Amino acid sequence: MAPERRERMDDACLKALRRIEARVARLEQAVLGGGDLLRAALNERGLKVYRCNPTDRLLLPEGAPDEAQERLYALLNRYSFRLYLRDAIRLGLFRPEELTRFCSRAAALRYGRFLESIGAATPEGDALRLTRPVSSLGPTLEWYVARLFERELLAPAIYGVKFRGLEAGGDFDVIAWLAGELAYAEVKSSPPKGIEVAEVSAFLRRREHLCPALSFFIVDTELRMKDKIVPLFEAAAPHQPVVRLHAELFRAGIATYIVNSRRGIAANIRRCLLEWRRRR
């Protein structure tokens, strides 16, 4: 290749890189600015956060580097990996090649090596043991969904949120500043059969205290919502009709969305958000 042509290509690549860097900077600024709006929205409601973004119950070891966090977030996008983690947590000590209920043996081995590489699991004989004695995937799933709001929807988010003096009690799993409004998401790592009407009622009470513009009840499953979750909402709030939006996505009342994981959590939230915007 002629030197002149190579130089032109280098200049073009450099300009493209600068455009990408500028775009990333604009996106980062948008997210950071949105964080101020999120805090302002909570302050307007008289809500004082005394805990958020806890790390003590995450799969990641304390002080995990950013690279490990990014790699975990990327792999959590795979539903099969999330199911694999549930089995690993249930067992505590496990042989990666045996966790093949939801993935191939090759994938199970890759997942095991990955957990070891980020410090989330340590070898013990011919098996692995999770580094932290977590009892549920729930907190890590909340962490993941908060990041998903930020990365995929450019919505600043906090997770595992507790407020002082709030009668509703319990954690608010994820709170985000989404599309210029306050949004609240409950995140369930249990399959539908493990969810009861009391949990739906508690979610609805927290929603009433927070007064978000829209809220999501996210169940990390590809199973049907109509069979178990929809009847729970109908029992907990009979005055709020539940309507099907598409496949297994539903709206309860004005702006509460029932979401599962089929076709991806981010894609399903986008579909709900579009429906919400069209009705405004």
Positions of predicted regions on the chain:
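Intrinsically disordered, low-complexity Ser/Thr/Pro/Gly-rich regulatory segments
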Residues: 2-280
